[in-house]
Design a protein with these regions (language model features):
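Short pre-active-site segment immediately N-terminal to the catalytic Zn-binding motif
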Residues: 169-186, 218-222
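Short helix/loop segments within enzyme catalytic domains
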Residues: 106-109, 113, 118-121, 223, ...
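Pan-zinc metallopeptidase signature
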Residues: 260-307
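Catalytic Zn2+-binding segment of zinc metalloproteases
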Residues: 192-207, 240
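Bacterial signal peptide processing site
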Residues: 37-41
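Catalytic zinc-binding patch centered on the HExxH motif and its immediate surroundings
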Residues: 137-164
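Extracellular mucin-like PTS domains
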Residues: 44-72
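Active-site recognition of the HExxH zinc-binding catalytic motif
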Residues: 116, 186-199, 229, 233
């Protein structure tokens, strides 16, 4: 990376940190209920609609992970994945009126798949591609029949990423914030990250731990989701290195991460926050780990189980 590029990245990182607070403040002022995101839907459940304030999101950053899982859950394989290298071949992900929603989501999916394929090959591991399905209203999966209310999700049983194109506009409308292309891209990269977790054996180790220690299930679920956010940030690091990510783009992704935070959604639904019920993490947590992946550009920095 050249010196001017490195300086620009430092500026972008600093502005991204400031954007985390700005995104929370803007979203806290929104009144309508927000739809949830059904990530890693092994049972077809989705996060309930809700809201929060910026201060509440910050205050509850660490409460959901009071039961600290063993660091061995992350596994040695993740540490073998190298830092994302400088790109050798640019790929266009630009969204335009002629591109179409489905085409853009498909392009992001395949770009994320290509990144993880390279990462696995560099580590001497085999990457088995995920399956992409774009749906409307409802879809039949190995995890059961899911409605559009679930939002985008990953089904471990058939290793499929399922995306409802209307989810993104609906999510933005319900909180009064327009979500741009890279907010959508963040969600897609997050779901692909769940596939990466399955291939690395992380999801299997989490499920085994859940069986042995049911009381810690929610805490481990939060860490699994935050790791997927971090992996999504690693992908965003790669898009930045290709010159396809601007400050506004990353702020857009941070805004989306805030909306799908458990505290944000709980506050909107009930007016209260109960960290013990979280399954995905607070707005501040999700923004933190997305930023960590983006700044570090290395999967090894995403050990949320050892943090």
């Amino acid at each position: 990376m050249s010196a001017p590029d490195a300086l620009h990245l430092m500026r972008l990182r600093g502005r991204a940190r400031a954007a985390r607070c700005a995104a929370l403040i803007v979203l806290a002022a929104a009144v309508p209920a927000a739809a949830g995101c059904g990530s890693s839907a092994s049972t077809g459940s989705s996060t309930s609609a809700a809201s929060t304030t910026a201060s509440a999101a910050t205050a509850t950053t660490s409460k959901a992970t009071t039961s600290k899982p063993a660091t061995s859950i992350a596994g040695a394989e993740m540490g073998r994945l190298p830092k994302v290298p400088e790109p050798t071949r640019p790929t266009s992900l630009a969204a335009s009126p002629t591109t179409g929603e489905s085409a853009f989501l498909t392009a992001v999916f395949h770009d994320a798949e290509a990144l993880w394929t390279r990462e696995f090959e560099a580590a001497g591991l085999q990457y088995t591609p995920a399956r992409l399905t774009i749906f409307h209203d409802q879809v039949h999966t190995a995890c059961g029949t899911q409605s559009a209310a679930v939002g985008p999700f990953y089904c471990p049983a058939d290793r499929g990423v399922y995306l409802d194109t209307r989810f993104f506009d609906q999510l933005g409308r319900t909180v009064g914030v327009r979500l741009g292309a890279f907010a959508r891209a963040y969600v897609v990269a997050h779901e692909v990250a769940h596939h990466v977790q399955v291939l690395l054996g992380i999801t299997g180790r989490v499920r085994a731990a859940d069986h042995q220690d049911p009381a810690g299930t929610n805490a481990r679920s939060v860490r699994l989701e935050l790791q997927a956010d971090c992996f999504a940030g690693v992908w965003k690091h790669a898009t930045y290195e290709r010159g396809q990510l601007t400050t506004a783009d990353f702020e857009d992704a941070l805004r989306a991460a805030a909306i799908v935070g458990d505290d944000f959604q709980q506050r909107r639904a009930t007016g209260t926050i109960t960290p013990e019920d979280w399954t995905h993490g607070s707005s501040a947590q999700r923004q933190h780990w997305l930023t960590t992946g983006f700044e570090q550009g290395a999967p090894g920095a995403c050990d949320t189980f050892g943090a």
